[in-house]
Amino acid sequence: MADINSKLEIGVTTGPIRGSRKIHVESARFPGLTVAMREIQLEPSSGEPPVRVYDTSGPYTDPKVTIDIAAGLPTLRRDWIMARGDVEEYDAREVKPEDNGLKGPDRSAGVPPFPNVVKRPLRAKAGQNVSQMHYARRGIITPEMEYVAIRENLGRKQAKEAMIRDGQDWGASIPDYVTPEFVRDEVARGRAIIPSNINHPESEPMAIGRNFLVKINANIGNSAVASDVASEVDKMVWSIRWGADTVMDLSTGRNIHDTREWILRNSPVPIGTVPIYQALEKVGGVAEDLTWEVFRDTLIEQAEQGVDYFTIHAGVRLPYIPLAAKRMTGIVSRGGSIMAKWCLAHHKESFLYENFDEITEIMKAYDVAYSLGDGLRPGSIYDANDEAQFAELYTLGELTKRAWEQDVQVMIEGPGHVPMHKIKENMTKQLEACGEAPFYTLGPLVTDIAPGYDHITSGIGAAQIGWYGTAMLCYVTPKEHLGLPDRDDVKVGVVTYKLAAHAADLAKGHPAAQARDDALSKARFEFRWRDQFNLSLDPETAEQYHDQTLPAEGAKTAHFCSMCGPKFCSMKISQEVRDFAAKQNAGIETFVANEAEAEAGMKAMSDKYDEMGRELYIGAGGREHD
């Protein structure tokens, strides 16, 4: 496949993240099952153990794996799926010209369709249900559940021993240790999902639920005016390198089908889509021409390819559309506006709502999870928490129960633009209306005044709602509201949201969350610069900023940085105070009990300070820099 790769000119970033190595933890329950993790190596002189962190990068950071984009990734889950005996191969539907869009410029940039398309996808045998929820409700612990349990337990043993548990969990049930049985129970209750289409065996199982680590999603995809297949594959690999737990392909231009195939065959994380986008392309971009038959065909097409979760805006009902008329910014969801336009044009109830049970039948045949879309989410803080938003939310709760009746996994999408004082209400109402199904929110953005910085305005809201219980945060890039993000924007968005998710885990009291913070803080206090870089969310940027002012190699062992310099470094001063105190107390077995002796000691040290010229550092020189 090397010749094909060179012709395709699809380049992706591979190799270990700096200062880290890929490790694999073996399962005791399922022979041969190993879970990939990242281990950050610390300076040997520190005497500190390596720090293990959650790894979403898949084989791309494993130096032992040869990456061949034209061949796709290894099919990790194929044997697990086949061993259950409830699936069958069948002839896939024929790819039609309209599957790749009928309007707009070609976005292939010379990249042909994926060369190794599976002609015979899998589906459930007649009368079978292959969803992880179905297995969980029958008491079955699948390899996927075992994988999740091992993956989620990062550092928990050490954290428990060190008694690092602090925070406010707002009623969550975060265990000290995640067992496969706990994972099974959470999935059975509907409080967590494991997005895992049987036609995406390349994916590494992960869980989305408020009793697990907070996850993040990165959006990619072409548009009618920008990007191409190669760029979107590169952005997918780039986003998971920096920590995206799932990726949504939101392509709206030409070559939608081919772009998605390339992404799926090379993605180790779950892939989500909004099928109405492709359905709209199939009818030439005219919302009024959409039909249930076109949409149904699109669902099957994408399920056969391996899409793990569908955003479906079934809560945008005809009676709710007038509620948005009084808004400042109306309906801002693309999917929501498409369905609103269809409903008004035909003056009929949404065909997504009317055919919801049939959609669910398709979902359970492939184990596609619902991501019930918030088509009436607020697009400005003026519209936050209004009647339209919450009317849709309660309908999503109704639909959740209907999906659960067929053992189909569900998560709920949320806003949007919400000021900080209104965020908690969103979480409270979602838990109440949707039976604790995982909440998946875009931000929310807490103010509308910062175009170009909306990764920050939304990161603030994301950290807050993640603390309250949101299970997955959809990233926002600096280009939000302005344009299609490039790979640099993708990285900024992912790192910002990894920060928000981690802050939420800390605030909730996640048992393993603080280990990395403590390791970095200790490295900072001990001036282990390389360890500080490597323990950070973005080692490259951390070192780049350090080297802009102190580029010399020796500066990476210096006990100061350019912010304060050697004389005013608070941590250096603290170390000297600590060392001095240790020397003074060497050999003393008990504290001084006599108050007079203590006072005399204090005066002696004060006199000594006067004799030395009142300098914090002996031999530090004069006061020319005051």
UniProtKB/Swiss-Prot annotation:
Residues 92-106 have a biased composition (Basic and acidic residues). [4Fe-4S] cluster binds at C561, C564, C569. It comes from Novosphingobium aromaticivorans (strain ATCC 700278 / DSM 12444 / CCUG 56034 / CIP 105152 / NBRC 16084 / F199). Zn(2+) binds at H417, H481. Belongs to the ThiC family. The lineage of its organism: Bacteria, Pseudomonadati, Pseudomonadota, Alphaproteobacteria, Sphingomonadales. This is Phosphomethylpyrimidine synthase. It catalyses: 5-amino-1-(5-phospho-beta-D-ribosyl)imidazole + S-adenosyl-L-methionine = 4-amino-2-methyl-5-(phosphooxymethyl)pyrimidine + CO + 5'-deoxyadenosine + formate + L-methionine + 3 H(+). Binds 1 [4Fe-4S] cluster per subunit. The cluster is coordinated with 3 cysteines and an exchangeable S-adenosyl-L-methionine. Pfam families: ThiC-associated (PF13667), ThiC_Rad_SAM (PF01964). InterPro entries: ThiC, ThiC-associated_dom, ThiC/Bza_core_dom, ThiC/BzaA/B. The keyword Kinase does not apply. GO terms for molecular function: 4 iron, 4 sulfur cluster binding; carbon-carbon lyase activity; zinc ion binding. One of its GO terms (biological process) is thiamine diphosphate biosynthetic process. Keywords: 4Fe-4S, Iron, Iron-sulfur, Lyase, Metal-binding, S-adenosyl-L-methionine, Thiamine biosynthesis, Zinc. HAMAP family: ThiC (MF_00089). Substrate binds at N219, M248, Y277, H313, S333, R334, G335, D374, G375, L376, R377, E413, Y440. Gene3D superfamilies: 6.10.250.620, Radical SAM ThiC family, central domain. Catalyzes the synthesis of the hydroxymethylpyrimidine phosphate (HMP-P) moiety of thiamine from aminoimidazole ribotide (AIR) in a radical S-adenosyl-L-methionine (SAM)-dependent reaction. Residues 92-117 are annotated as: Disordered. It comes from the Bacteria. Its cofactor is [4Fe-4S] cluster.
